[in-house]
Regions:
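Short, structured active-site "lid" loops
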Residues: 42-47, 52
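Catalytic and substrate-binding clefts that recognize carbohydrates or anionic sugar/phosphate headgroups
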Residues: 107
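Catalytic domains of carbohydrate-active enzymes, especially glycoside hydrolases
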Residues: 51-70, 200
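Short acidic, Pro/Gly- and aromatic-enriched capping/linker segments at domain boundaries
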Residues: 69-86
Length: 359
């Protein structure tokens, strides 16, 4: 069974020869692994969550059974470095490079109050030239041999607060500020187009996501989620299924996300990610017993403690345990619960792939 067959068997709830593997790296990890393997290091793509679709050749060499694709900045608006070293993207978000990640520095809609403020803001043009070039290249190279996962994370909530600022946006949700619905409608419009396009290009899984969880709880209550977000996700999922009724919809939310899972299943979710095991209520046994008959599990290998701090033998044993729990009767994609971070040794990364690829 080749990688694509294995991946398709899994997402269609059939038993593969083994669980497929899909990991992602931070750029620092990709660089040190490329040096270790004596292969060229490729810079990350110019994309909102670039790690999901970058370094694919390297990750396939290590053992990934699928590759990621994503929307990229168009030819006429690549991310640009400003005079003070800050970075601006096509949404108008301005970041400050801070070690392993870029941190938000200026929110372009920090002073938003009304729908007029939304109408005046310049949003990305989904039809801009060059946006799909990298996705098309990846599919042309790997589409017949590996699974294709299309990234559409920061689907609504996160893009909204990236524009406004987290504290203000959460407060304005509670205050029912005038601009909230127009802003969410505009983001929904753009990301629905992106999702439909990536399905048309040949994606097998559309990987949506917003982080609704914290380590111990949720960032908002279910009432707020059901008022502002769930109806929009329902509409988006319907649009995606119109393009391809067989597309599998994955949802990423870091943290203690389990209270939201039934609502997502109700509106058509197929795959849950990233299964952050140290977050409250995200223990593998609990998730499998509650939702194992309804969703595919994608993730679950701890990047907070297991991969950086344990021995290779401990890592291998824990991955076998994850496969035995989540993968019983199929339905599991072996993956870290986030990008593998730079505090993880080469030895432990190799141990992850070695154990993940075993039958």
């Amino acid at each position: 069974m080749n990688s694509r067959e294995r991946f398709l068997q899994t997402i269609n709830r059939k038993m593969p020869d083994r669980a497929p593997v899909f990991a992602t790296f931070t750029p620092q990890v990709a660089q040190k692994m490329a040096e270790y393997l004596h292969v060229p290091y490729e810079k990350p793509l110019d994309s909102m969550l670039s790690t999901r679709a970058s370094h694919m050749d390297l990750l396939v060499k290590l053992g990934n059974d699928a590759v990621g694709i994503a929307t990229c900045a168009p030819d006429n608006f690549p991310a640009k470095t400003l005079e003070n070293g800050l970075i601006e993207n096509e949404w108008g978000m301005i970041f400050k490079p801070m070690g392993l990640y870029n941190e938000f520095h200026i929110y372009p809609l920090a002073n938003v109050e009304t729908s007029d403020d939304i109408s005046k803001h310049k949003f990305p043009d989904p039809l801009a030239k060059g946006r799909w070039d990298e996705a098309e290249k990846t599919i042309a190279k790997y589409g017949k041999t590996l699974g294709i996962i299309a990234d559409l994370e920061t689907t609504l909530f996160e893009t909204a607060w990236y524009l406004v600022g987290l504290e203000k946006f959460l407060m304005d949700l509670m205050l029912e500020a005038e601009y909230i619905n127009p802003l969410l409608d505009k983001i929904q419009e753009i990301h629905t187009f992106y999702g439909r396009k990536m399905i048309e290009l040949g994606a097998d899984v559309l990987w949506c996501g917003d982080d609704f969880g914290t380590q111990q709880s949720q960032i908002m209550d279910l009432e707020t989620f059901r008022k502002y977000f769930k109806p929009r996700f329902r509409q988006m999922f319907k649009e995606f299924k119109k393009v391809n009724p067989n597309i599998k919809l994955a949802w990423h939310s870091c943290g203690a996300f389990s209270p939201f899972i039934p609502d997502f299943i109700e509106i058509g979710l197929d795959i849950v990610n990233p299964l952050q095991p140290l977050a409250t209520g995200m223990e593998p046994e609990i998730l499998k017993s509650k939702f194992g008959n309804e969703v595919i599990f994608f993730g679950g290998v701890c990047v907070q403690d297991l991969l950086p701090n344990k021995s290779p033998d401990e890592i291998k044993a824990e991955i076998i345990r994850r496969k035995n729990i989540f993968g019983k009767k199929g339905g599991y994609i072996v993956a870290p619960a986030h990008n593998i971070q730079d505090d993880t040794s080469i030895e432990n990364i190799l141990a992850f792939f070695d154990a993940a690829k075993k039958l």
